[in-house]
């Protein structure tokens, strides 16, 4: 596919004079273009929903969510994956990010790494990919060889595949099971897909991981009840979450949090039901980790 035929590589007619504008006017142009991004993502919600349902289903079966991309796309996948353990209390293996060129490419551009299909395949092979996993290929253009190679290999293995691109009719679309293609239009600076395309990709990734984790019971109301309290900030957050969920006395909250080794979910259930730790844990296990379901079971029992 020729670059000049890609929407993401087009020249934006609204920013032709951006090099001659005042600082404020220049920034207004950028901001006006950024406003188009959430609208483009909104149009893709039906496809994002399909992906979330598949991801949640596979994670429940013990599978993994693996993001793979090059450059900005790869970094965004790693960013999203790295936030899942502290936010949702999951094993770091559950959601992973892979970038063309390896870890050094997270901090420094390794431009030629994206040009080899075999490298994408090899990087996924190292992960012992299986049919229980979901591979999300991220490429603004939808044509990055490294990502396409990875997706083709994922299909061979029987893993479910999702593509994220900002070009609607890309090579990627022909490969994946679910295509997510928010069309954000040409960039403010021609071809600089770290801008609108990158923002769109980040919004989609937010939805994929957050949506899947909600469906796994990692959220109660809108509270992150599986947060790992590994530092002072997160310990304070854990206390606040329990307070918001239960409205209990702060001394009671602190006491039970310490008893449960700062297990927020268990603490909430113990306070709301009056059960001891063993009984609350048993109830939570029967509810597959869903607080709302556990409360319903307890209510029906009484």
UniProtKB/Swiss-Prot annotation:
What Gene Ontology terms describe what this protein does at the molecular function level? carbohydrate derivative binding; carbon-oxygen lyase activity; ether hydrolase activity
Pathway it works in: Amino-sugar metabolism; N-acetylmuramate degradation
What UniProt keywords apply to this chain's record, in alphabetical order?
A: Carbohydrate metabolism, Lyase
Q: Which Gene3D superfamilies does this chain map to?
A: 1.10.8.1080, Glucose-6-phosphate isomerase like protein, domain 1
Segments forming domain SIS: 55-218
List, from the UniProt record, the residues annotated as the active site of this protein: 83, 114
Which Pfam family, any one of them, does this sequence belong to? GKRP_SIS_N
- What is its EC class? lyase
NCBIfam families the UniProt entry points to: N-acetylmuramic acid 6-phosphate etherase, PRK05441.1, PRK12570.1
Supply any other comment: A lyase-type mechanism (elimination/hydration) is suggested for the cleavage of the lactyl ether bond of MurNAc 6-phosphate, with the formation of an alpha,beta-unsaturated aldehyde intermediate with (E)-stereochemistry, followed by the syn addition of water to give product.
How this chain assembles, per its entry, is: Homodimer.
Identify this protein by name: N-acetylmuramic acid 6-phosphate etherase
From which source organism is this entry? Thermoanaerobacter sp. (strain X514)
């Amino acid at each position: 596919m020729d670059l000049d035929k890609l929407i993401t590589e087009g020249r934006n007619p609204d920013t032709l004079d951006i090099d001659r504008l005042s600082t404020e006017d220049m920034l207004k142009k950028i901001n006006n273009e950024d406003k188009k991004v959430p609208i483009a993502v909104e149009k893709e919600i039906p496809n994002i929903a399909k992906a979330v349902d598949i991801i949640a289903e596979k994670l429940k079966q013990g599978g993994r969510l693996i993001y793979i991309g090059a450059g900005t796309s790869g970094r965004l996948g790693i960013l999203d994956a790295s936030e899942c353990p502290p936010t949702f209390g999951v094993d770091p293996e559950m959601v992973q990010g892979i970038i063309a060129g390896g870890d050094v490419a997270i901090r420094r551009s390794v431009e030629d790494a994206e040009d080899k299909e075999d490298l994408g395949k090899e990087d996924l092979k190292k992960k012992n990919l299986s049919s229980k996993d979901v591979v999300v290929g991220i490429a603004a253009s939808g044509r990055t060889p490294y990502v396409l190679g990875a997706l083709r290999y994922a299909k061979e293995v029987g893993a479910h595949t999702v593509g994220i691109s900002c070009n609607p009719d890309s090579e990627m679309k022909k490969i994946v099971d679910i295509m997510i293609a928010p069309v954000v239009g040409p960039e403010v600076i021609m071809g600089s897909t770290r801008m609108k395309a990158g923002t769109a990709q980040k919004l989609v990734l937010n939805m994929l991981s957050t949506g899947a984790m909600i469906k796994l019971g990692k959220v109660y109301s809108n509270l992150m009840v599986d947060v790992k309290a590994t530092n002072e900030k997160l310990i304070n957050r854990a206390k606040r979450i329990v307070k918001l969920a239960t409205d209990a006395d702060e001394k009671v909250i602190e006491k039970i949090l310490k008893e449960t080794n700062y297990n927020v979910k268990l603490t909430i259930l113990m306070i709301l039901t009056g059960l001891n730790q063993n009984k609350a844990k048993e109830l939570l296990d029967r509810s597959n980790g869903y607080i709302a379901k556990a409360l319903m079971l307890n209510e029906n029992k009484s």
